[in-house]
Amino acid sequence: MSDSAGGRAGLRRYPKLPVWVVEDHQEVLPFIYRAIGSKHLPASNISFLHFDSHPDLLIPVNMPADTVFDKETLFGELSIENWIMPAVYAGHFSHVIWFHPAWAQQIREGRHHFLVGKDTSTTTIRVTSTDHYFLSDGLYVPEDQLENQKPLQLDVIMVKPYKLCNNQEENDAVSSAKKPKLALEDSRNTASTNCDSSSEGLEKDTATQRSDQTCLEASCSCSSENQECQTAASTGEILETLKKGKAFVLDIDLDFFSVKNPFKEMFTQEEYKILQELYQFKKPGTNLTEEDLVDIVDTRIHQLEDLEATFADLCDGDDEETVQRWASNPGMESLVPLVQSLKKRMEVPDYEMVHQAGLTCDYSELPHHISTEQEIEYLIQSVHYLLKNLPNPTLVTIARSSLDDYCPSDQVDTIQEKVLNMLRALYGNLDLQVYAAESPPS
C-alpha cells in the first residue's frame, strides 16, 4: 500500500486520507475537481478505480462537449449514469477500471481502448467504442468524426466473493482474527463470443506474494478496431499501470455489494415486459463495417427519439385517440395495453418516469441482486485483499445510492460501516466527510 513513486512528484499530500461520502454518485465529482484545483490530484492522467454494480459510463446525450470546461454548468447537467465520461473528455481521467460483481454484466469483460471526443456534427461528446453498452445509447461515432480526441483505457474486471475455507457451520460470522483463504470459483465466460477468456486469479505484486488469491475474473484485451481478445490483467499489471500514472482515485458505490432494480417495484411484471419490448436493442452481429455501425446507431437514435416524443405527448394528455395514434407506428402496438394497465393502477401515470424506466430496458436489465449478509462480507474481504496490494489512493469517494433505491435502504448503513472499517484497516485514520444529506461543494 505504499505510494507510487515518480508520478506523484510535485503533488500536495493530504495529512490523512480524505473519504467523501455522498448520496447520488455524480455528487462525488466536485470533490475530485476540488482536489485537482488544490494540486492534490494532477489535471490529467488520473486513474479511476470504480467499484459499482453499474458502469456509470454513459454520456449526457444532448450536452455540448464544451460544457466540461464550465464546471458549475457541468455539475448541473450530470446524472448518476453519466458523470465519468465528461471528466475523461476534459482530460482528467485516462484510465478507468470498472470492478463489478458477478450480477452486473453491462460491458464486455476485458481491456478496451477507444477515443472520447467531440462529435463534429452535433458538438456533443461521443466515443469510438463499439460495445453494446455505447451502441444501445447511440453514443458511437467513427474516429474521423471526433475532434479533441482523448484516449481512454477501460478495464472491466469481475470481483467474485471469496469462500471461507472454514466450516461455516462452526463459523457463523467472519472472524477478523482468522485470515480467510481466497479461493477461485469456476465461472462462465462473460466475454464476447470471439474472446478467449479464462478464469484465473490475479497475481499479487511480487513483494507481497501470498498463497491466498483475490477472486477476480481474468480479462481480455479488446479495441474498437480489433475485436480479437487476449487474456490479460493481473494485480501486478494493475499495479504497474497505477505506478505509471500520476495518481488514482478510489471510488465505491455501496450498491456494488447489494443492488436493486428500483423500476421492478414501480411496474407490474407485464408492464415491465412491455417496456422491454418497446425499448429493446437487438445486439448486432460481428464483423460489422463502419457504415453498418453508423446505420445501427442512427436507427437506435430515431427509436429513442420517437419513444421520448411519445411519452412527452402522453404527459400532455393520454386520451384514447392520442394513445392509438402513437400505437399505430411500427413496433409501438404494445403501447395500448401498457397505458391501459398504468391507468388502472394510478390516477395520473408519470409518463416521464415510464420513459426513464424504458431507457434501462435495452439489451439487458439493470442488475438486481439483494445480497445476504454473508455475501456482503465475502465481497468486502475480496475488495480488501485487492486494495491491500495497490498503492494508496489520493482520495476515496463513496456513493450510498439508497434514496433512489439502488442500494437497499435496510442494508446501506451496515454496508457503509463495513466499507469504512475496511478502509481504516487498509489506510489508518481517515478524514471522513459525509455529505449524504447535503449539497456537495462547488
From Swiss-Prot:
Family membership: Belongs to the UPF0489 family.
Region (Disordered): 175-208
Biased composition (Polar residues): 189-200
Organism: Pongo abelii
UniProt-listed Pfam families: UPF0489
Record protein name field: UPF0489 protein C5orf22 homolog
